[in-house]
Amino acid sequence: MAPGMKEKKIDSLKLPEDLRSLSLQELEHVAEELRNELIDTVSESGGHFASSLGATEITVALHHAFDTPHDRILWDVGHQAYIHKMVTGRRHQMGSIRTNKGLSGFLKRSESPFDAFGAGHAGTSISAAVGMRHALDKLSPERYVVAVIGDGSLTSGMAFEALN
């Protein structure tokens, strides 16, 4: 490290399990570092970062609280999940997002075991979580399934049907 440069807390984090031993203050610091790095990276590479910036704290909190990938977090749209990609071992690949042979701009199950659902069309995460939860009730009832959905997606008919 160059003299005068402060080591980032996120440099010591490789996977979500590394978040689980951190204090609330450390988690807040990690969220700030992730947000700043996402802005820098996406400003150069392109992409949609507003939804991920808005979901930074919840992403860090969910990966801190739940045993991912054993527990499943389902993101409604890929734009919410850039920070998720960063904390699940893909941080140093973020410059390749949405490029040929780079990271997908969406959630992609073949890209990571932490991508439990291949989100594409908005409004599907709650329905997918309900279905996944019913399947897990038979196989592994001690697992949790969490759906993350934004305000725009929450207005879709499929989301309302799942809530019903």
Predicted ranges, named:
Residues 2-88:
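N-terminal amphipathic, basic-rich helices that act as targeting or association modules
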Residues 48-164:
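Cofactor-binding active-site loop characterized by glycine-rich and histidine/acidic residues
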